[in-house]
Amino acid sequence: MIDTTLPLTDIHRHLDGNIRPQTILELGRQYNISLPAQSLETLIPHVQVIANEPDLVSFLTKLDWGVKVLASLDACRRVAFENIEDAARNGLHYVELRFSPGYMAMAHKLPVAGVVEAVIDGVREGCRTFGVQAKLIGIMSRTFGEAACQQELEAFLAHRDQITALDLAGDELGFPGSLFLSHFNLARDAGWHITVHAGEAAGPESIWQAIRELGAERIGHGVKAIEDRALMDFLAEQQIGIESCLTSNIQTSTVAELAAHPLKTFLEHGIRAGINTDDPGVQGVDIIHEYTVAAPAAGLSREQIRQAQINGLEMAFLSAEEKRALREKVAAK
């Protein structure tokens, strides 16, 4: 179902949600961190979703073991490098990795700015080694409040040329976008793109707010847009992208089953929506699974899957010249 003549992208992929179970085990041993299991087989149920979680917050707790073993900046650098290696193994030509340095720093009180620098270094080395093109999106973890988000923002601004966009993720219901207006004003002043997790746990009003108040050019998940016809019209007319994550939305119980996922309707409505993974290490899936298993199960035709693949590059935070060069590079193969 993947068109090999087109670039394959993943533009909604959490770096800190893609820490390999084997790496968690190895870092736990290296830093003498107590883990819930001592073998890979017995650890996996603790760090990957085995059965669907009741809600988004429950799903997010699965990520915690991955960041609990980040006891040094070298560990952060390693997982960033491995994220690029995983992208290469998946056949991705371009990936946008998003990460929350405050979340990654929390367990061992690492310097937030140091985490940002370590991630930049690891991703840069990975791109050199594996030939994948990547850009970084900075996440503010709304769950930790406005002050913590300000600290993350300042760490990103210290490396503003290495950050492509700003995102807001975490507890959407408890911490609405209205709390973070000043943060996004600073992000736009820095010349960054804006993408916001919205319409996943909260309703369509969260998406409207992300667009109107925070300046979102893309929406992470955005499944609740299906409840507002005027919003769907607006998304299509303004070419505001929806970063769909099929399996993730089932695992968080945001959508009951793949057959009920709104991605097919979004595409039929002319919305620029694409297929992405979200937290592949925690989910136990990869981009190939999303295209070949999840998308057909969500009712997408072969042509709709191809359109979603095209949309992935169109939505990417790349210049027109960068997109053209990537298309030509893939076509030449």
Swiss-Prot record:
Cofactor binding annotation: Binds 1 zinc ion per subunit.
Keywords: Hydrolase, Metal-binding, Nucleotide metabolism, Zinc
GO (cellular component) term, any one: cytosol
UniProt-listed Pfam families: A_deaminase
Binding residues annotated for substrate, in chain numbering: 14, 16, 170, 279
Active-site residues per Swiss-Prot or TrEMBL entry: 200
Gene3D superfamilies reported in the protein's UniProt record: Metal-dependent hydrolases
Record site feature (Important for catalytic activity), residues: 221
The keyword NADP belongs to this UniProt entry's keyword annotation: no
Reaction it catalyzes: adenosine + H2O + H(+) = inosine + NH4(+); 2'-deoxyadenosine + H2O + H(+) = 2'-deoxyinosine + NH4(+)
Signal peptide: none
UniProt GO BP: adenosine catabolic process; hypoxanthine salvage; inosine biosynthetic process; nucleotide metabolic process; purine ribonucleoside monophosphate biosynthetic process
PANTHER family from the UniProt entry: ADENOSINE DEAMINASE
Function, as annotated: Catalyzes the hydrolytic deamination of adenosine and 2-deoxyadenosine.
Family: Belongs to the metallo-dependent hydrolases superfamily. Adenosine and AMP deaminases family. Adenosine deaminase subfamily.
Protein name, as recorded: Adenosine deaminase
Organism: Shigella boydii serotype 18 (strain CDC 3083-94 / BS512)
Protein encoded by which gene: add
